[in-house]
Design a protein with these regions (language model features):
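Immediate N-terminus of the mature polypeptide
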Residues: 1-98, 102, 108-146
Length: 146
């Protein structure tokens, strides 16, 4: 049984929902949930940024019915204008883990394994989403400011 919408990346690194037979293509993976959890911008606290007007945040969080809950992660904060130190890689892993925490709380997965490593001028991420039935891995090469 399909549980999510299929998302793919084209040669220009643009993301698209796939279409099949005139409808959104479904998948057994957690594509949309993963991408929204990572790339949706959780609002940074005032202490995390140098200027309060740079706190960002995904617009959909304005409509949350759960007080204090925001979709997304601080992934954006940990990958922009930072040096790629081992300490910052750990902060990035923590931001990703925090963004995916809701899937564990909702019983969609049982745990995550996240590893960030430096690659020529960027970051490689390995994200494993582990459920009782299967393990789904995603790999990303990210190029960020060093």
């Amino acid at each position: 049984m399909a549980i999510d919408l299929k998302v793919s990346q084209d040669a220009n690194n643009d993301w698209h929902w796939e279409i099949e037979n005139g409808d959104l293509k479904k998948t057994n993976a957690l594509d949309t949930a993963l991408y929204m959890s990572l790339f949706g911008q959780k609002r940074a606290s005032k202490d995390d940024v140098t200027k309060p007007d740079l706190r960002r945040g995904h617009f959909i969080n304005e409509f949350s019915r759960i007080e204090g809950y925001e979709i997304g992660s601080l992934f954006w904060l940990r990958t922009e204008q930072v040096k790629l130190t081992d300490g910052n890689l750990r902060l990035l892993e923590n931001a990703i883990s925090d963004g995916l925490k809701w899937m564990i709380e909702d019983g969609i997965i049982t745990k995550t394994k996240i590893a960030a490593s430096k690659v020529s001028g960027g970051v490689n991420l390995q994200i494993d989403l582990i459920s009782k039935l299967q393990e789904d891995s995603k790999y990303y090469d990210l190029f960020v400011a060093t």
